[in-house]
């Protein structure tokens, strides 16, 4: 409802309705299919400019989200992931899961929430695949549970050079580099909600991903734009994410990362 009111041109991924791009006031929110440059191109260009210069706010609720827990959760993820995930609580790690040929089966972010609890996040199309992969490939005897919590949390990406100012204004927290370094994850109070904020980006700008219990999603979304009005925040969609991640050289599972491409071939040796 909030997205439609803002002029969203909606698309879908794995049953999730989500904003591809936002039409400006007065323009019909529909895609114009043409052999020429489409009418939505300047709409996305404006979203990209705002994300680079002020703040873009993205609804990324369609992210696949699952908890990996249990006495052997660390050992299971250490076995499956290319990166070392035995990190301090509140640390997020970008990593992959590979097949026996060294090719990608999953492209994920793993955040340690507790000694034996991890939040694993991947693309919208990968939830069933990733959960199945972890369950099937976990070593025999490991006491590890995998629970899909995708529908329990909305995700808002607050991205851009003014994202720190916006979230500091809303939360009252210290979000400086010293207090909240890159790849740090911790809880923030946002209005009536307690959300998990992870400092990470898929668009190449300063930003945070906010994981919000769904019952508080509408209120937090409204609060973000109320605070964001003071810094020029705009709603932005998946066309903008795709354009900016390509410009930055970030990879995506199912596109650059597939089962016959290795981390070295993908230029992601640093994740191993």
Named regions from a protein language model:
Residues 1-272:
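Glycine/proline-enriched, intrinsically flexible loops and inter-domain linkers
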């Amino acid at each position: 409802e909030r997205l439609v009111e803002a002029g969203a041109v909606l698309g879908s991924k794995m049953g999730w309705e989500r904003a591809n791009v936002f039409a400006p006031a007065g323009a019909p929110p529909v895609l114009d299919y043409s052999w020429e440059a489409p009418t939505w191109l300047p709409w996305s260009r404006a979203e990209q400019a705002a994300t680079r210069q002020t703040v873009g706010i993205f609804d990324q609720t369609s992210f696949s989200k699952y908890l990996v827990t249990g006495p052997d959760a660390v050992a299971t993820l250490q076995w499956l992931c290319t990166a070392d995930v035995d990190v301090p609580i509140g640390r997020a790690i970008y990593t992959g899961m590979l097949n026996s040929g060294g090719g990608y089966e999953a492209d994920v972010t793993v955040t340690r929430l507790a000694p034996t609890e991890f939040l694993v996040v991947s693309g919208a199309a990968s939830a069933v695949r990733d959960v199945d992969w972890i369950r099937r490939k976990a070593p025999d005897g490991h006491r590890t549970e995998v629970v899909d919590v995708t529908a329990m949390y909305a995700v808002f990406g607050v991205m851009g050079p003014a994202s720190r100012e916006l979230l500091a204004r809303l939360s009252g927290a210290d979000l400086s580099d010293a207090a909240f370094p890159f790849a740090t994850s911790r809880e923030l109070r946002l209005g009536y909600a307690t959300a998990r904020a992870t400092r990470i980006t898929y668009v190449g700008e300063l930003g945070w991903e906010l994981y919000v219990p769904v019952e508080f999603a509408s209120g937090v979304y409204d609060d973000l734009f109320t605070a964001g009005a003071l810094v020029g925040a705009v709603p932005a969609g998946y066309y903008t994410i795709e354009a900016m991640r390509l410009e930055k050289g970030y990879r995506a599972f199912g596109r650059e990362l597939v089962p016959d491409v290795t981390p070295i071939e993908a230029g992601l040796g640093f994740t191993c």
